[in-house]
């Protein structure tokens, strides 16, 4: 699989707690995502806020085993990222990806105690199988996602919980693409329901102007879409 460009948005990690959770005992419990990248992001956020210190050199592959100092005696509960909001009632705090927080009816901006900086480089990308990155279908999808219409939707819909990272949004179309040849075709793309499928729905409207159908397939995990792209079952 090949990364094409860091498009569209950054899903921010937020540290949240349930109202009424005191964490007043000898230790507190924090739920964190258990996949490699998001667990490291959670730990780096906690380090940035002064709750823990990681071993020297621990970065995007950090796990709880890389914690060097834990002065608040935090106990960590490692949970599949999509399930972190569901265990919030059982822990004192949780570090949640903003897309999953939004799906759980949480507001990452208003409800969080801390958030990743808006300049976080963990941007979501459009990924296709190596060799397909310069096809007209992929370029058409890329142009639609990098449009001003999509950027405006992200700003208005998510109010800072999700951030567009497109530097110069366009009109949604790529002059190098033969849209007449693409008319009547279908582009398939896998995405999580919130916010990715919602954002893709805006791109779908843009592509429909050229009689191109965008088939959005929703998944709740990160792994299966990657496998489907690699196998060629979906386009992106």
Positions of PLM-derived features:
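C-terminal motif of bacterial Sec signal peptides marking the signal peptidase cleavage site
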Residues: 16-20
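Short, well-ordered beta-strand elements
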Residues: 26-31, 182-194, 212-218
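Periplasmic-binding protein-like
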Residues: 40-43, 47, 137, 145-166
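Short, polar/charged alpha-helical segment
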Residues: 44-51, 57-65, 193-215, 224
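Short beta-strand->loop
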Residues: 63, 77, 105-119
């Amino acid at each position: 699989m090949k990364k094409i460009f860091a498009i569209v948005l950054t899903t921010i990690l937020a540290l949240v707690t349930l109202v009424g959770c005191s964490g007043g005992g000898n230790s507190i419990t924090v739920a964190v995502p258990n996949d490699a990248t998001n667990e490291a992001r959670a730990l780096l956020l906690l380090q940035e806020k002064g709750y823990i210190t990681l071993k020297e050199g621990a970065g995007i592959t950090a796990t709880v085993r890389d914690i060097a100092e834990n002065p608040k005696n935090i106990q960590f509960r490692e949970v599949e990222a999509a399930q972190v909001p569901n265990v919030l009632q059982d822990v004192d705090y949780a570090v949640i990806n903003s897309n999953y927080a939004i799906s759980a009816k949480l507001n990452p901006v208003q409800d969080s105690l801390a958030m990743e900086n808006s300049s976080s480089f963990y941007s979501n990308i459009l990924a296709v199988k190596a060799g397909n990155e310069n096809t007209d279908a992929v370029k058409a999808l890329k142009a639609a996602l990098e449009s001003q219409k999509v950027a405006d939707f992200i700003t208005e819909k998510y109010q800072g919980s999700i951030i567009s990272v497109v530097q110069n949004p366009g009109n949604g179309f790529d002059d190098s693409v033969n849209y007449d040849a693409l008319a009547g075709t279908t582009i398939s793309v896998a995405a999580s329901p919130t916010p990715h499928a919602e954002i893709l729905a805006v791109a779908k409207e843009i592509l429909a102007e050229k009689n191109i159908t965008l088939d959005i397939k929703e998944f709740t995990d990160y792994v299966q879409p990657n496998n489907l792209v690699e196998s060629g079952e979906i386009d992106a």
